[in-house]
Regions:
Chain A
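Membrane-interfacial helix-loop segments of redox and metal-homeostasis proteins
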Residues: 1-138
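Short, low-complexity, charge-dense intrinsically disordered segments
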Residues: 141-148
Length: 148, 199
């Protein structure tokens, strides 16, 4: 059980960290393109669009690097979960409003759809696992002790 | 790992992409040596291109190109599904040969009346409305020039070389860095970007 959890822990860190690094790196290549995607959501005031396009990729890169380094992993995972939840909420609201916008997540021309929302939910799972890992371990230990 | 990460990030920051032809015969506004250059690949019949021109580029032309802070270059990229866009591009290029004033007037008219001529194919009427009778007659002669089709083909080839897959797509070059943008961008966002570079 402990070995399986350890493997899962590393897999989640590597996958999630890699995704955040790639996503941030991609957005850094053209902050204006990312700004165009944010503008497409029609949710953010114009004055916030460029600052978001400038700084959000760095936040993603920092989260990716911290996830890979393992430093304060629980808090970093909570941060990653919060960011992913915000993305999911924004994508869902934009989709429900019927706006034909680009996701701007990992590539351009990727329109917001149930598929892009489901993809973000899938990415959220390892982040939630890492954030709740200690509790899961404690629960597992308690269960093992009780059944002994 | 972190050194590799930093190297990767550093590679994301400098310019990437193919530098375009620096000649400015297709410069719709601004000086060729302006600190910011925008190259737009556009289709006259595409509604998003109309939106980009009417809501963003016209304001860029007014506020930045007139002060030579930004140079806007338009490349023709007529899409196959739009039956009249190549004809519109030919008229636009013919007007370009008369001068920037006439060219801008034709581009303005074509985008402003897009819904009308796109529907009935009355491109010529939209062009006639934008020019004096004399200039219109000159455009009717110039449009026969086979080099106009050559320019369109060159623009399309340039777009394909730069991986333009849809319209509008534009490239902004500033501070030695080129950024590709697919789709529209509100003027206020672009203005904030410009004002960091040229006040």
């Amino acid at each position: 059980m402990a070995v399986a959890l350890r493997i899962l822990h590393w897999a989640c860190r590597i996958v999630l960290g890699g995704i955040f690094l790639y996503s941030g790196y991609f957005k850094l290549q053209s902050p204006l393109q990312f700004a165009a995607a944010i503008a497409g959501y029609k949710l953010v005031p114009n004055s916030f669009i460029m600052p978001l396009a400038d700084y959000l990729p760095w936040v993603e890169i920092a989260l990716g690097a911290l996830l890979l380094s393992g430093w304060k992993i629980r808090y970093v995972s909570i941060g990653a979960s919060a960011l992913l939840l915000a993305f999911i909420a924004i994508l869902t609201v934009t989709y429900i409003r019927g706006i034909d916008a680009d996701c701007g997540c990992f590539g351009f021309g990727d329109k917001i759809s149930p598929r892009t929302i489901a993809r973000d939910v899938l990415i959220l799972l390892p982040a939630i696992f890492l954030a709740a890992e200690e509790r899961l371990k404690n629960s597992a230990t308690n269960y093992t002790n009780r059944t002994k | 790992m972190f050194v590799a990460l930093l190297l990767l990030l550093a590679s994301a920051l400098p310019a990437s992409g193919v530098a375009a032809d620096q000649s400015c015969e297709q410069c719709l506004g601004g000086a060729p040596d302006a600190p910011i250059k925008i190259e737009v690949f556009s289709d006259f019949q595409c509604p998003a291109c109309r939106e980009l021109y009417m809501d963003t580029m016209k304001l860029v032309l007014r506020d930045y190109c007139s002060l030579d802070k930004v140079c806007v270059i338009y490349h023709e990229f007529p899409l196959q599904g739009h039956p009249y866009s190549r004809e519109a591009a030919r008229y636009s290029l013919a007007a370009q040969k008369l001068g920037r004033l006439q060219w801008t007037a034709v581009v303005d008219s074509l985008y402003a009346n897009q819904a009308v001529w796109s529907d009935k194919g009355t491109v010529q009427a939209a062009v006639a409305r934008a020019l004096s009778p004399d200039d219109f007659q000159k455009v009717l002669k110039l449009i026969q020039d086979p080099s106009i089709n050559g320019t369109i083909e060159r623009d399309i080839a340039l777009g394909q070389k730069r991986d333009v897959q849809s319209t509008p797509t534009f490239f902004i070059t500033a501070l030695g860095r080129e950024q590709k943008v697919v789709g529209g961008l509100p003027y206020n966002v672009l203005k904030e970007f410009f004002d960091r570079i040229v006040k």
